[in-house]
Amino acid sequence: MPLTWKDSGLRWYWVAVLVFFADQLSKQWVLANFDLHESLNLLPFFNFTYVRNYGAAFSFLSDAGGWQRWLFTIVAVGFSTLLTVWLRRQSASLLKLNLAYTLVIGGALGNLVDRLMHGFVVDFIDFFWAKSHYPAFNIADSAICIGAVLIIWDAFLSGKSETDSAEGVKK
């Protein structure tokens, strides 16, 4: 285990802070400038549209009656804590994993603040084609998804290198 924060993945925590503030500032801008369901068309396939998400990704459990707010709060705190512990235990040189963990932490904490302050998450990024809309999302959601992809990518690369080295031993 690295001895100082400079030697550990915690050195990358600034990414989580940056994601958190970008997410919160963008949501505050939406709350100050949009009415619920109001849209601003930016491109023929892209709007800013203020919606409230009472659930998780893709509005999962959004109509569950309110208990999901506390479930998702516990999940966000739990994952953020776990990833912070893992950051502390790994080397600062593990670029992909440190970036992935801090993206997820920043996104989870950004959405956590919304849940605690408002009881819902502010979503506003709206991609569409004709009349078909992708579920609205926010900067925190984007960071969580990018972080998850990086974690999966790293797992596949780690598995491949272990397989390659195991095959090398067999020869």
Curated annotation (Swiss-Prot):
This is Lipoprotein signal peptidase. The gene is lspA. Belongs to the peptidase A8 family. One of its GO terms (biological process) is proteolysis. It is a multi-pass membrane protein. InterPro entries: Peptidase_A8 (IPR001872). Its EC number is 3.4.23.36. GO terms for molecular function: aspartic-type endopeptidase activity. GO terms for cellular component: plasma membrane.
